[in-house]
């Protein structure tokens, strides 16, 4: 099968030509500010016009809540599309291709499960993306668990500190408000008095204790989330992805915090097989649906 894979993130949109499960070509562009799905669908198709005639289907993975009506942002600070945003319908109308759409972390969870399960005999696992926001996907009893309203896996909006910072979802102390790329960036700006990218912050953290402490706070929040998920779902494995999650040294911080906790709560964490493109590949692999509930 030949799939046009589209990954909609808060910062960028990635496009891939996936042939028989392999990413053949890839490109990306910054997520634009748009008021209607038609405009974005046209822009996406213009970027991948050279692939379009050759693909069989279109797969979308996106941050936010996915429904038959479209995309709805749980945190408008990470995705500012009008709600609901019927991107899938417009891509189908303009291209004539069959289109499927799935939450990005759910899509990545399914992709990672398909890659890891034969080797590790995984039955229950979570995928956590630490990027602009924090998202998650759950595979339970070897099936992708989406829930009745497709809301399952929005673990970035579980609360760690009820007195913590206000999240864009309007709860206080969400994992996303503490650990996300946006949260780290806001903390760095408050600390250093100027805008500093997360890439620069990770470099600075190698010799600056304040920068290192910001990253450590994020890593410990994600580690605590992993511990909570182990206690709730008895997971075999947690896979970490996203621009922050895959940054040098971040995963080691997460695992080190987990390893200090009581053994019964500990869970193995590992980096995404799909690296920075786990969500993009997941967009294509949602068509591999033998246990995609």
Curated annotation (Swiss-Prot):
Catalysed reaction(s) here are: an N-acyl-D-mannosamine + ATP = an N-acyl-D-mannosamine 6-phosphate + ADP + H(+)
InterPro entries xrefs? ATPase_NBD, ManNAc_kinase_bac, ROK, ROK_cs
Supply the alphabetized keyword list.
ATP-binding, Carbohydrate metabolism, Kinase, Metal-binding, Nucleotide-binding, Transferase, Zinc
Pfam families for the chain: ROK
Which GO BP terms sit in this record? N-acetylneuraminate catabolic process
Q: Identify the metabolic or biological route this protein is part of.
A: Amino-sugar metabolism; N-acetylneuraminate degradation; D-fructose 6-phosphate from N-acetylneuraminate: step 2/5
Query: What residues does ATP bind to?
Result: 5-12, 133-140
- Give the similarity note: Belongs to the ROK (NagC/XylR) family. NanK subfamily.
What is known about its subunit structure? Homodimer.
- Which HAMAP family does this entry report, sorted A to Z? ManNAc_kinase
Output this protein's name.
N-acetylmannosamine kinase
**From what organism does this protein derive?**
Vibrio vulnificus (strain YJ016)
- This chain is encoded by the gene named nanK
């Amino acid at each position: 099968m030949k799939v046009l894979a589209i990954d909609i993130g808060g910062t960028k949109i990635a496009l891939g030509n996936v042939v028989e499960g392999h990413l053949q070509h890839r490109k990306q562009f910054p997520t634009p500010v748009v008021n209607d799905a038609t405009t974005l669908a046209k822009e996406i198709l213009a970027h991948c016009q050279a692939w379009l005639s050759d693909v069989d289907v279109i797969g979308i993975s996106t941050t936010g809540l996915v429904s038959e009506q479209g995309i709805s942002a749980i945190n408008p600070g990470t995705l500012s599309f009008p709600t609901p945003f019927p991107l899938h319908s417009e891509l189908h109308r303009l291209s004539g291709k069959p289109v499927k759409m799935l939450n990005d972390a759910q899509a990545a969870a399914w992709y990672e499960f398909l890659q890891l399960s034969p080797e590790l005999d995984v039955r229950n696992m979570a995928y956590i993306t630490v990027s602009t926001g924090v998202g998650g996907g759950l595979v339970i009893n070897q099936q992708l668990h989406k829930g009745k309203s497709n809301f399952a896996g929005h673990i970035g909006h579980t609360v760690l500190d009820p007195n913590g910072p206000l999240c864009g979802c309007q709860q206080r102390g969400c994992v996303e408000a503490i650990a996300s790329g946006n949260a780290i960036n806001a903390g760095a700006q408050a600390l250093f008095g100027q805008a500093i990218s997360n890439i620069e912050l990770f470099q600075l953290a190698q010799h600056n204790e304040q920068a290192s402490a910001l990253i450590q706070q994020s890593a410990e929040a994600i580690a605590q989330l992993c511990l909570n998920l182990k206690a709730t779902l008895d997971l075999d494995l947690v896979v970490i992805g996203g621009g922050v999650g895959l940054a040098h040294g971040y995963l080691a911080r997460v695992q080190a915090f987990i390893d200090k906790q009581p053994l019964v709560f500990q869970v193995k964490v590992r980096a995404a097989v799909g690296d920075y493109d786990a969500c993009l590949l997941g967009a294509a692999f949602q068509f591999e649906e033998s246990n995609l509930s």
